C-alpha cells in the first residue's frame, strides 16, 4: 500500500463539514491558507464548501516533521491542481522544497517555516485569515511547543491568533 500523502479519513471529513455548518465567524474570513497535503486540502474544502472563499496552498504549512514519513510527503503540484482546481497553487513548486526521503527536518527548520509564513501574512495585510494545517505544526505555531500533539489541541477547531 502506498502511504504517500494520505487522504482525510471519513471521521475528519465529517468533522470538517460540521465545522463549516456551525462556525459563525466563517463569514468573516478573507482568505484560506492551506497545507498542500491532501488531507488538509480536503479539510479546507469541507469546511468552506460553497463559501466562495479563496484557497491558497503554502508549503510552509505542511505537517512536522517533513522527511522520511511518506504520509507527510505531498503530491506533485501538477497532480494537486487536477485534484483541487479551486485552490491557488501558485506559491508552491512542482515538488516540495522541504521534503527529504532520508532525513527528518529539525524543530529549528519547522520554526523557520513558521516564521516565513508569518512574514508572508504580515506582508499581505489581511486581517481575518484561516490557516488549515496539521496538529504538530499548529501546536508549534500557536504555543511554541511540540510534544503530545493532542494535549490541549482539538482537531477541526477554530483557534484565534494575533500576529
Residue ranges with predicted function:
Residues 1-55, 155:
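Active-site-proximal alpha-helix that buttresses catalytic centers in soluble enzyme cores
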Residues 1-7, 51-113:
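Phosphate-handling substructures
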Residues 22, 43-50, 79, 83, ...:
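Alpha-helical structural signal in soluble globular domains
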Residues 25-28, 121-127:
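Glycine-rich phosphate-binding loop signature in dinucleotide/nucleotide-binding domains
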Residues 33, 127-137:
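Beta-strand elements within well-structured catalytic alpha/beta cores of enzymes
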Residues 38, 61-62, 136:
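Catalytic metal-binding/acid-base residues of hydrolase active sites
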Residues 109-124:
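A short, acidic, amphipathic alpha-helical segment used as a generic capping/interface helix at domain edges
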Residues 145-163:
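Domain-level recognition of soluble alpha/beta enzyme cores
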